[in-house]
Swiss-Prot record:
Changing residue 84 to M: In DFNB1A; the mutant disrupts cellular communication. This is Gap junction beta-2 protein. It is found in: Cell membrane; Cell junction, Gap junction. SMART domains: CNX, Connexin_CCC. Its main location: membrane. The gene is GJB2. GO terms for cellular component: connexin complex; endoplasmic reticulum-Golgi intermediate compartment; gap junction; plasma membrane. It holds the Pfam family Connexin. Residues 2-13 dip into the membrane without crossing it. Residues 14-20, 95-135, 211-226 are cytoplasmic. One of its GO terms (biological process) is transmembrane transport. Belongs to the connexin family. Beta-type (group I) subfamily. Disulfide bonds join 53-180, 60-174, 64-169.
Length: 226
């Protein structure tokens, strides 16, 4: 599945989201997926080929690169976007299932008085209530967990969010401690900080939406007659 397909699927979820959820999807598309596809790949490029060490020992450069960059930044961000987007796909599946059930009941004649035809069922805005509320709320909760987990993994794996210009490596088969140089470290640091900052904004939006849904749920409960 490419990014265009993912955008199409999540665009369908956007119709059933809250206003805060729509802002989150906009940030996800413009500031994360578009930046990752258009700009970040150009900055990183073939990063292993641009990783230079002051030794001719066969295998030393590859081992040092693998030690300092066990997973490419691009691939880690792509994996993060997949994990963060997956809960939203569950909401889309739930909405599709609910519409399928309404179509089935309409064909059987159980709810013919509620809809004119099947097309009206397809275009009906689905309200976030009942079991869909739990699915939607759970999806937001897991998005926050995935975002925070990947930010932590990123920080631990790369020892911070800034890209070092020079790294020293003494892993085998290097004959001694060698100096290795990272290409375009400043540009990569800027992109890294930007992506982390956008992840933080997404977490803030998700937490805000979660609080909004919980408050609306509690106020709806309190209005019900005892």
């Amino acid at each position: 599945m490419d990014w265009g397909t993912l955008q199409t699927i999540l665009g369908g979820v956007n119709k059933h989201s809250t206003s805060i959820g729509k802002i989150w999807l906009t940030v996800l598309f413009i500031f994360r997926i578009m930046i990752l596809v258009v700009a970040a790949k150009e900055v990183w490029g073939d990063e292993q080929a641009d990783f230079v060490c002051n030794t001719l020992q066969p295998g030393c450069k590859n081992v040092c690169y693998d030690h300092y960059f066990p997973i490419s930044h691009i691939r880690l961000w792509a994996l993060q976007l997949i994990f963060v987007s997956t809960p939203a796909l569950l909401v889309a599946m739930h909405v599709a299932y609910r519409r399928h059930e309404k179509k089935r009941k309409f064909i059987k004649g159980e709810i013919k008085s509620e809809f004119k035809d099947i097309e009206e069922i397809k275009t009906q805005k689905v309200r976030i209530e009942g079991s869909l509320w739990w699915t939607y709320t759970s999806s937001i909760f897991f998005r926050v967990i995935f975002e925070a987990a990947f930010m932590y993994v990123f920080y631990v794996m790369y020892d911070g969010f800034s890209m070092q210009r020079l790294v020293k490596c003494n892993a085998w088969p290097c004959p001694n401690t060698v100096d290795c140089f990272v290409s375009r470290p400043t540009e990569k640091t800027v992109f890294t900080v930007f992506m982390i900052a956008v992840s933080g904004i997404c977490i803030l939006l998700n937490v805000t939406e979660l609080c909004y849904l919980l408050i609306r749920y509690c106020s709806g409960k309190s209005k019900k007659p005892v």
